[in-house]
Amino acid sequence: MTSTETMDPLQQVPQGVESAFPAAEYDARQAAVRDRMRARGIDLAVLTGPENIFYLTGQQTPGYYTFQALCIPAEGAPFLVLRGLEAMNAKLNTFLADLVGYADDEPPAAALAGALRDRGWLGRRIAVDRNAWFLTVNLHAQLVAELGDLGDATGLVEPLRRVKSPAELEQIAAAGRANDAGMRAGLAAVAAGATENDVAAAIMGAAIASGSEYVGMEPFVTSGPRSGVPHTTWRRRRLQPGDVAVLETSACFNRYHAALFRTVAIGTVPDEVHEMYAVCMEGLDAALARLRPGNTCADVHAAAQEVIDRHGQTAGYRKRTGYSMGISFAPDWGEGNILSLFRGIDVPLEPGMVFHVPITLRAWNRFTVAVSETVQVTDGAPRTFSDIPRDLVRL
């Protein structure tokens, strides 16, 4: 038996060498969360959402389908409870000194309770993020059985993620470049006789070759009547003359995403396709003109909605005008749980916020036309993260 076979596997992994950011970036984020915890009377916050865990530590793994819990004390060092198999990944991606791995036959709630007990946290004011997708009702009940009453840490981290730091904006810009590569390849692959699968393969291959990691949600590649049904995507359909093909793509760089919509007319299409696309372009221009400090998220939606309504297209636009972008893991590529551009969202816009602004109009079960940009709020005109022309592509 060699010496390496007897070593703790965790000791063979270097600390933080694959982290997206330096330790100082996470230290500042954790300090901001602690300020919010103290204001809410929380001694220890237990966070289970992969996006918030990544934001505060850099931890990323496709294995987030197993329970992981970042424990942030109001005073003291954080620790991460996770499946033992993932502990090496956490060391590689984070600067956390305290990693608690549990075995596959150990109940996660018991593992978390044991970690808290060992560190003297039982009986203190512990709060969990009740809105996290990966905290099931059953698991929450098990935690209460182990730990007693738990406070609510919902919304503790998300407001801090609204405005992106310069380092975060660099990641989104890199995602935008990879996404442009994917979109260009997808547009080039659209042709009568090609399949939706051909187009999707071109998009994903080019984006990955240009630096994208696995994305939070698959691209949407849909054509013909299928495109008139929201969120249909590739399913082997062969493109035909007269089809409208709609591509919505994203790419990811260090878990930060950028997304984009473009539309293709294959041969001769009905006049209303061109008319509706012109309305989309006008709606996007109106939204982007309002996307600046001094306005609210609701103001941006109202600007786009006014264009839609004025052109008699209200029935085909039953949605928000946009959503925030940044850190994502499946099942979504956006941060729509943080901010939406929609009525009633009276949050003021600030420089550094990033949104995907998709303007889509649907002739239900006939076709869809759509155009979008991922954009950053600045002190002036918004910054876009794509160089691809917005015009309807005509083949």
Which functions belong to the PLM regions below?
Residues 1-395:
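Active-site neighborhoods and metal-handling regions in enzymes and metal-associated proteins
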